[in-house]
Design a protein with these regions (language model features):
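Active-site rim/loop-helix segments in enzyme catalytic domains that contact anionic ligands
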Residues: 1-139, 271, 282-285, 290-293
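Metal-dependent de-N-acetylase/amidase catalytic core
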Residues: 1-12, 109-308
Length: 308
């Protein structure tokens, strides 16, 4: 145990690519600083849309081999970020991507035809217990996952939120599954977020650049869907601008899911490290560390007196 990093971060995500989009720069920063970073991915993203024409045969309605391919993409993304500890919840293939449909109001909802092994249908206690084993092994001081809406409402994101929160609770219960190791209570839990002001700023730049298709229907001066967080509820912004290039490399590794030649990516590249390197969070358990001039905490590990 002498090689165990003093500070340890655990992230729970639904599909390969979610981690790189949301916290890629934060992950790379903490790895570079010698802090432990563990990623748990709940599914292999089998139901994802394939954006590479020559790989369309991998899709769920064709060869149904996308999950295996995305496993490789995720490994490449983790290599780009420097992360060496990645696990699939319960082991690869335990839970399958549930798929989704779009509601008329613009948020994601469960698809009509869901696979029997879909993560959305997973037994919550069983899935959370898989996470308990990871928590008690890694003993993280910080957990990052989605909010109760799962960000934009994808059923697997919502389920990942439930599993992460319940798993954290069970991991800290001394009488629960002693065979899985000594109880460990995670001191700080964050929900990943994007502030409304930051989203409005990005939307305005997209519209000024003539892009009306990215985030179609959203007006930078109009109401925003609940996937964005009111500024007063944001507690933390990690400035990992020095690691923006690693985040971009990780995004490019998820080639079947993320196109890097569209207007959104081009505009973000023009903004450089500011666009890719600042990642926001909302503390839901634990004590905030020191605040900066912007009124936000700048380090997820801030305020942890005894790393344990």
């Amino acid at each position: 145990m002498t090689d165990t990093p003093t500070h340890r971060l655990l992230l729970v995500h639904a599909h390969p690519d979610d981690e790189s989009i949301g916290q890629g720069a934060t992950m790379a920063k903490y790895v570079a600083e010698g802090r432990g970073v563990t990623l748990v991915t709940c599914t292999a993203g089998e139901m994802g849309e394939v954006l590479v024409p020559e790989l369309e045969h991998l899709a769920a309605d064709k060869d149904d081999r996308l999950g295996e391919h995305r496993k490789g993409e995720l490994a490449d993304a983790m290599a780009a970020l420097g992360v060496t500890d990645h696990r699939f919840l319960g082991g690869f293939g335990t839970y399958r991507d549930s798929g989704m449909a779009w509601h008329e109001d613009g948020h994601a909802i469960p698809a009509d035809d869901i696979h029997d092994n879909a993560f959305w249908h997973a037994d919550l206690t069983e899935a959370a217990t898989h996470l308990v084993q990871v928590v008690r092994e890694v003993r993280p001081q910080v957990l990052v996952t989605y909010d109760q809406f799962g960000g934009y409402g994808h059923p697997d994101h919502i389920q990942a939120h439930r599993v992460a929160m319940y798993g954290a609770l069970l991991a800290g219960a001394p009488s629960y599954r002693r065979d899985l190791g000594e109880a460990w209570e995670i001191p700080k839990i964050y929900w990943a977020c994007i502030s409304e002001s930051r989203m409005r700023e990005g939307l305005r730049k997209l519209r000024e650049a003539g892009d009306e298709t990215t985030f179609e229907g959203m007006d930078p001066d109009g109401p925003l869907p609940p996937m964005f967080t009111k500024d007063e509820d944001v507690t933390t912004e990690v400035d990992a601008s020095d690691y923006a290039d690693q985040k971009i490399a990780a995004l490019k590794a998820h080639a079947t899911q993320i196109t890097t030649d569209g207007p959104f990516f081009a505009l973000s590249n023009n903004e450089g490290a500011t666009a890719w390197g600042r990642e926001q969070y909302r503390l839901v358990k634990g004590r905030l560390g020191p605040m900066g001039e912007n009124g936000w905490e700048s380090d997820l590990f801030a305020g942890i007196e005894d790393p344990g």
